[in-house]
Regions:
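Transmembrane-helix motifs of polytopic, lipid-linked glycan transferases
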Residues: 55-58, 153-184, 222, 354-361
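Membrane-proximal lumenal/periplasmic loop motifs of glycosylation machinery
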Residues: 89-100, 114-138, 157-160, 205, ...
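Short acidic/glycine- and proline-prone juxtamembrane loop motifs at membrane-interface regions
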Residues: 202-215
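Loop-to-helix entry region of an early transmembrane alpha helix in multi-pass inner-membrane enzymes
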Residues: 130-169, 190, 206, 346
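C-terminal luminal/periplasmic domains and tails of membrane-associated envelope-modifying transferases
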Residues: 465-500, 505, 514-639
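Transmembrane-lumen/periplasm boundary regions of multi-pass, lipid-linked membrane glycan transferases
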Residues: 102, 108, 260-261, 265-271, ...
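Start-transfer (signal-anchor) and selected internal transmembrane alpha helices
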Residues: 1-86, 290-301
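Signature aromatic-anchored transmembrane alpha helix within multi-pass, membrane-resident enzymes
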Residues: 9-10, 70-74, 187-191, 241-245, ...
Length: 639
């Protein structure tokens, strides 16, 4: 046995160790169900397996990282640790909405695994049809389990659970692209290209805000490494299995990564078709036909297997009207999205892309720029049919943009013989600029924090004010006072709770509920307000709440015209004296004053219909979310 093991490669020994670890976990899970150690150990195993898979992909893609590559990689990872530590420690950010979803899922996954291993894995499987699956929690539990389990802890732990595999694959992708472009100055190419891509602000933007969606980039890079220079000239079953695994992984990470998958597959098939046509014209029609046949057979088999594997998700996608339900977020279509993409990429990056396009044209190497451009265009068109992107959804376009950055880096590196100092200063300035970018919920243009705070245009002064308030809170003490008041005046055992009308980035129920994670002081004591048509139901809990909280002025941070909390607040203010009396008031210290109103008269049909009638347009679009909800509540309360 020892002789067999000794003959295995290092990677083979790693996989043997992982298999032994998996067996040990199965035995441990059966022997000690509900152990607090089981989920962290599973997470540690998953991270090790993911890293081993990344190394296996590099080997299959024919990429080998030498000592220089590894030194740069480790140095950049160490710099990322310091960066995250500094950024998270220099702000007071309160996690809410999408920024708290994964943290809550991590808590829920921990609670499920605390019951038993079966309950934990069942919890993960049951989430497959949700907008936020629990797939990532398998990888983020370790080392999160060793931390204080705050929101900042969750963001920081991603540097250890997500970033190593991501950087290894990005380094491999950089080497692969350099080889395909026949770069001569490989030292500077890798240094410039790898650092340029790794520091691109929208790679880390969501992670700094508590959203580990960049986890999907791991599988995107795997897919690109396995396919960029592969032309189906022969049958390669191990590669096919890895491509399938990478595709499944990226879809399980976030459903909207499907737009990248579709866009990339379309661009890749188009590239392969063009190369096959050229091959046929060069006198090799048989080889060209065999290429396309293998591609079609693999594509059909992979698509069929993927549908079977992700059948619950496929059913949800086919049965749910995403364009209708998410229409609120489609506030400008492709025209506005193109403008947003332009602002996010920025002038410095477009200069690099321009250099890359000129470089590719001169060397007659159009494949990679065309592949990236086609992928971006298809993904962009498909996504904007449903909605426009937020900063975290920008991740589905990141692989295409990074590919263009690498082509530009090749041009910059191979052109260093001329104007060397200017070009190196351009690279250095861009790195400093990129690292200094503020990662805020309101970030539209990637700018350093000091530039945002002192932006000279008065037209954006309100944006700057709100950006400061949401990114680095100065009202934590005031929020805690409101929390303490609600906690003292609502008895959860009696079913008492408060309802909050404001549902805005500046103030919403999540801000108050999750102000002191992992402690959730107002668990079951604070209900969220209505805001997004197609997402939020008619809020019948308003009529059950002991207290209603509103604010003056009502927070409305760059909301679209169809936003609902403003309308509800106006209706409440016009009729509140008939059913409520003022109970308390809180000055938040930033121009906003919260007022607590206590219900004095129980809700009746007339009050419910008063509010429902004001949402006739929404009711016509979503009756199952408005009139049907209201009527069911009225019937349940004998009204």
């Amino acid at each position: 046995m020892s002789g067999i093991v000794s003959r295995l490669s290092v990677l083979g020994k790693v996989w043997l160790g992982l298999a032994a670890g998996a067996l040990a976990l199965i035995v441990f899970g059966l022997a000690a169900p509900g152990s607090s150690l089981f989920f962290p150990l599973v997470s540690l195993w998953c991270n090790a397996a993911l890293f081993a898979l990344a190394l296996l992909v590099l080997r299959r893609a024919g990429v080998e990282l030498d000592l220089f590559h590894k030194a740069v990689l480790v140095g950049l990872w160490a710099a990322a640790v310091l960066y995250f530590y500094w950024v998270l420690g220099s702000r007071t950010f309160l996690y809410h909405w999408d920024y708290v979803n994964y943290i809550l899922k991590q808590y829920h996954a921990e609670a499920a695994f605390a019951q038993s291993a079966g309950a934990g894995f069942r919890f993960l499987l049951d989430s497959i049809t949700e907008d936020y699956t629990s797939f990532i929690t398998l990888f983020t539990e370790f080392p999160f389990c060793l931390s204080g389990k705050t929101g900042d802890d969750y963001a920081f732990c991603q540097v250890f659970s997500v970033l190593p595999s991501l950087l290894v694959l990005l380094a491999g992708l950089t080497v692969k692209v350099g080889r395909m472009l026949r770069v001569k100055n490989r030292f500077w190419y890798f240094l410039i290209g790898f650092s340029w891509c790794a520091t691109f602000p929208f790679v880390r933007m969501s992670a700094v805000l508590g959203q580990p969606d960049w986890f999907g980039l791991i599988f995107a890079f795997m897919l690109m490494l396995l396919t960029l220079d592969y032309r189906f000239d022969g049958i390669d079953l191990p590669r096919y299995l890895l491509i399938f695994a990478a595709t499944a992984g990226i879809i399980l990470t976030r459903r909207w990564y499907l737009y990248f998958v579709v866009g990339y597959c379309f661009a890749y098939v188009l590239m392969l078709a063009v190369s096959s046509i050229r091959l046929a014209k060069d006198g090799q029609p048989s080889r060209a036909v065999h290429r396309m046949v293998r591609l079609v057979v693999f594509g059909l088999c992979a698509a069929g297997a993927m549908v079977l594997l992700l059948l619950p998700m496929v059913r949800k996608i086919l049965s749910f009207d995403y364009a209708g339900r998410y229409s609120y977020y489609n506030f400008g279509g492709i025209t506005l999205e193109l403008a947003a993409q332009t602002l996010r990429i920025g002038l410095l990056n477009f200069i690099l892309i321009g250099m890359g396009l000129w470089f590719a044209a001169k060397r007659r190497l159009p494949a990679l720029p065309c592949l990236a451009g086609a992928e971006l265009l298809v993904s962009l068109v498909l996504f904007t049919r449903v909605q426009n992107t937020g900063s975290h959804q920008m991740l589905l376009f990141v692989p295409g943009w990074l590919l263009l950055f690498l082509v530009g880096s090749a041009a910059l590196a191979d052109g260093l013989k001329k104007h060397t100092a200017v070009k190196l200063c351009y690279w250095g300035f861009t790195m400093v600029f990129a690292v200094s970018v503020r990662c805020s919920p309101l970030t539209t243009v990637a700018l350093p924090g000091f530039v945002v705070d002192h932006f000279p245009l008065k037209a954006v002064s309100e944006f700057v004010r709100l950006d400061k308030l949401t990114y680095d809170r100065t009202d934590a003490a005031q929020i805690q006072r409101v929390d303490d008041w609600i906690d003292a005046h609502c008895d959860a055992e009696k079913g008492e709770f408060a309802y909050m009308i404001p549902h805005d980035m500046l103030y919403n129920s999540d801000i108050f509920q999750y102000a002191a994670l992992p402690d959730i002081q107002l668990q079951g004591k604070l209900a969220a307000g209505i805001s997004i048509p197609g997402t939020h139901e008619f809020p019948v809990r308003f009529f059950e709440a002991k207290y209603v909280l509103t604010a003056e002025p009502l927070p409305q941070t760059f909301v679209s015209g169809g936003e609902l909390s403003g309308r509800w607040n106006a209706l409440f203010c016009a009729a509140r004296d008939a059913h409520f009396t003022q109970a308390a008031s809180f000055d938040m210290g930033n121009g906003t004053v919260f007022t607590v109103w206590e219900r004095t008269e129980p809700a009746d049909r007339a009050e419910v219909e008063y509010y429902l009638d004001a949402f006739a347009q929404e009711d016509a679009l979503y009756p199952e979310m408005f009139s049907q909800v209201a009527e069911a509540w009225l019937a349940g309360h004998g009204l």
